[in-house]
Structures are given as structure tokens and as C-alpha cells.
Amino acid sequence: MLRSNAITQGIQRSPNRAMLRAVGFDDNDFNKPIIGIANGHSTITPCNMGLMDLANRAESALKEAGAMPQTFGTITVSDGISMGTEGMKYSLVSREVIADSIETACNAQSMDGVLAIGGCDKNMPGAMLSMARMNIPSIFVYGGTIKPGKLDGCDLTVVSSFEAVGQLASGKIDKDRLIAVEKNAIPGPGSCGGMFTANTMSAAIETMGFSLPFSSTMAAVDDEKAESAAESAQVLVNAVKNNIRPLDLLTKEAFENAISVIMAVGGSTNSVLHLLAIARTAGVDLTIDDFERIRQTVPVICDLKPSGKYVTVDLHKAGGIPQVMKLLLDAGMLHGECKTIEGKTIKEVLRDIPSKPKENQDVIRQISNPIYKKGHLAILKGNLASEGSVAKISGVKTPVLTGPARVFESEEECLTAILDNKVKAGDVVVVRYEGPVGGPGMREMLSPTSAIVGQGLGEKVALITDGRFSGGSYGLVVGHVAPEAAVGGTIGLVEEGDSITVDANKLLIQLNVEERELARRKQKWEKPKPRYKTGILGKYSRLVSSSSQGATTDQI
């Protein structure tokens, strides 16, 4: 029986049907499944500016497949545009708003399934959280990646522009060059083009079976992207008929598959936060330690930006996520029996994918010839992060540094010091009170990390924070430090000049201060007053969980 029968069947539902007739239903439509289209279209960001065409294609395809589509809007924010500002505090919050809005619309209207369309970073995990909560047949359509910008024959991404700021500050380029990069970095619609957060999460969603094979690496402007939206609609209608639900797919093994692919492609630190949140919502026992366990056995085999050479459209040409998955499957690093929204197993989906990467390309390598022998997202613990932290060590030859702490109470303070050349080789930069509660909202530190890299200090300076990093960040960066400063974490006790050790080889993040001294500082520490007492940020800071649990707000 259809869930939507609650609003379409029986004499008592005559007023409900009257409303539905006004939006296009007729006598023959009340026995059809009602499918929601959660449309994240927006012109505030290139990531989402092309989604309306995909929604229209999906709507037509749903009708052709015998369903009744109902389109509703959900929000997005632009991480790239809000980066480095107070507005960035709303980015992670938007993940919860997206999840809440999709859940609200679908459950209020008794929809039988949902096709969610998104582009910017939080669209993907937001949609997945709602799907796990509702457990109705669901599919995700990614808006697609942007094609690279070009300047002097070189590929550009949005990170190129952030790094140019640091290069200008250190005298490596002039202002004309910075403006040239600015004008060429973002050529049109699509999500940021490297293996940054949006492309990482779309890859994870494809791996877990919630979007169609190859669809997570398609370019936003290519015809195949619109065709995949139409095909996704047909697949979803079949899933409704066959009662294939999200919790059937969201198993521990599916999450392990997603982590393996994220390691293999060199994906974003944000994936740790988002997968923990989705797993918690789905009732799956996934912990931050699972990421470290899998990292030890899965190599990085894709040479992708931010630390590598290529962009996501290059990965697509080289075989996309299915090619990566096939290599992992053959190496025993993937669970082949996990189900997809199509009703097939992963092994069945990958049956016709070649067992070797394509020749004449070096985007995807053999397992035996990796970029890095182990995954690039290391989970560090120690007295500075007893619940754990996430280090992204791709692009770093020696992921070990002991140095003096340079302590900043906000991202703005930190960036000013970097651009004024006050951060030197060997320093350990600490940015605190930027966590889920303290920020609130865990701002991403792309501006400081890009400035450090732009000044040539990416190998020589460590940056640790209870906030987050953009998928575009690389270097010796450690985020998601938990417990965070605002709830009494040790990061809040660090003083200027303290010795800190970051050692990714030993999985250690340690404040080299005697326990007696730390106890004295802890006794003197006072919980800061909340930066926001009202509005969504005030509400968020009161509800949000630790980053080690995914920073969710709905489990009280």
C-alpha cells in the first residue's frame, strides 16, 4: 500500500484531493505514487545554478514512469562565497536545515519517495540525513562538477584563487596575476572541481548505492548529467514498487565501502564528519576509529586536486568511481554484496568494469602503484584530542612537526597574522573556539591554509583547530579536534609558545605540558558566554553534538 493513500483515499480525504486537483492531479492520478523532488536550485552559487534543468528532466521522467511528482525547494549556502567570513558559521548548520526541510516536506505530504537534487557541499549529507530519518525510497541526483578554469595552459579551481591571496602576500605574484586567476578560476555551473567536499560526498553516495553509477563525476554542463536525472527518476519509481528503502542500503559494510573509496580518491576531511552523522542517524555503529582502521589498508590511487594534479572531470574520463571501486573490489577492499537503489549488488554493478585502469592516463593508478600506500585521512589522538581529530596528510612528505604554539581565538586573527608574515616555519598554529558549539558551526579554515600554502609554508607549518577544513585544504592540517575548546577541551588550555607535537606516523597530537600545569589551567578556565543566544546559530549551539559524533542536532 502506498504511503500517500493517507491523503488520497476515502471519502474523508475529499478536501485533500481538492487541493491536489489544484496542483494538477486528476481522477487517474490518485492511485499513483507521489514522489517528492527536493530541488536545491539557487543562483547564489555556481554549484547549484544548473539544478532547475535537472529537476525539470526528473519531473518529466517521473510522470512517464507512472508517478506524480511534487517539487519543493530546499536551501543551500555557498561555502566558497561565505569562506573567511561570519557567514561561514551557517555552512554546517545548513546541513541540518536541508535535512529538516526535506523530512518536513516529505512526511507532511505523505510522499512515497524522494528524489533529491543538490550541488554544494552540505546538500549531499543533508539529503542523506533526511533519507535515513524518513526511510522511504530515495535517490540522489548530483548537480555535477564544474569544468576546470584555464590560465596559461594550467587548470584552475577555486582553491587556486585562495592560494593566490597567500602568493600575493608573500610577493610571489602581483595583483594583476591575482585578478587573472580570479577571473578564470570558475568558468560556469558546477561544484568545485577538485576532490573537494562536494565531489567527495557525491562519490560516497554513489558508492553506497544512492545514486547511479558514473553520475557522481559527470560535469554539470554535459548532456549526460541531465540524462542521468531522468534515469534516476525511473530507478526511483522501481524502488518504490519494490519497496527498496534507505536503511536496507545503509549497513556498516556500505559505510566501510564509502570510507575505502574516499581514501582511494584522496577525499575531504569533511567526509568523516558527514558519514559519522549519517551513520548515527541510520543507527549504524560507525566510529571515528573505523576511518583509521580502513586507512591502514586502503591506498590513495587517484592523483586529484587539491594536493594532486587532476580534477574530477579527468577522473570521469578515466573511468569514474566505478573504476576505482572495481580495483578496490578485486583487491578485497570493498564489500561486494552491499545493495544499491537499483536492487543490484555492488558486485553486479561492477561486473563489466575493467579490472585494470585505462591505458594512457595516470589519474587512476593500480593498487600496486599508489600515490600513497595508506589513506590520507589520519585519526590523531592524544591529550590535545582525547575524542580524536582528523589530519589530512596528502601532499606532505613528512607529516611530523613539533613546534611552538601560535594561538588564535578566531580564523580572522589567524589569517591576519599569516598575511602579515608573522607565522614562521616550524610554528604550530592553533585556531580555537571555532567548533560546533563554540563557533558556532565549525567554520572551514580554507583561507588560512591556502595562505600558508601560498607562502610556501605548507610543509613547514601545522595548523590545528576545533573547526573544520575545506575539501580544498591540504598540508599538515588537523581539524575536528574534540573535545572542542568551548566545552572545556584541552585545546582551550593551550598558551602561546607551548610545545605541540603533531605526528601522523604515530597518530599523535600532544600538548607537551605537564599534567600538573594542565590541571592548574583547567581550574582557572571559564566557559565562555555563547556568541549567539538567539536565532538559528543560538539554537544550533545548544543542540549540536561533538564533532566526534558527527555534529548532529536531532538526537537529544
From Swiss-Prot:
Keyword Cell membrane: no
Molecular function GO labels: 2 iron, 2 sulfur cluster binding; dihydroxy-acid dehydratase activity; magnesium ion binding
Sequence positions bearing N6-carboxylysine: 122
Sites where the protein binds [2Fe-2S] cluster: 47, 120, 192
Keywords: 2Fe-2S, Amino-acid biosynthesis, Branched-chain amino acid biosynthesis, Iron, Iron-sulfur, Lyase, Magnesium, Metal-binding
Active site: 470
Chemical reaction(s) catalysed: (2R)-2,3-dihydroxy-3-methylbutanoate = 3-methyl-2-oxobutanoate + H2O; (2R,3R)-2,3-dihydroxy-3-methylpentanoate = (S)-3-methyl-2-oxopentanoate + H2O
Family under the similarity heading: Belongs to the IlvD/Edd family.
Function: Functions in the biosynthesis of branched-chain amino acids. Catalyzes the dehydration of (2R,3R)-2,3-dihydroxy-3-methylpentanoate (2,3-dihydroxy-3-methylvalerate) into 2-oxo-3-methylpentanoate (2-oxo-3-methylvalerate) and of (2R)-2,3-dihydroxy-3-methylbutanoate (2,3-dihydroxyisovalerate) into 2-oxo-3-methylbutanoate (2-oxoisovalerate), the penultimate precursor to L-isoleucine and L-valine, respectively.
Record's protein name: Dihydroxy-acid dehydratase
Species annotation: Prochlorococcus marinus (strain NATL2A)
Gene: ilvD
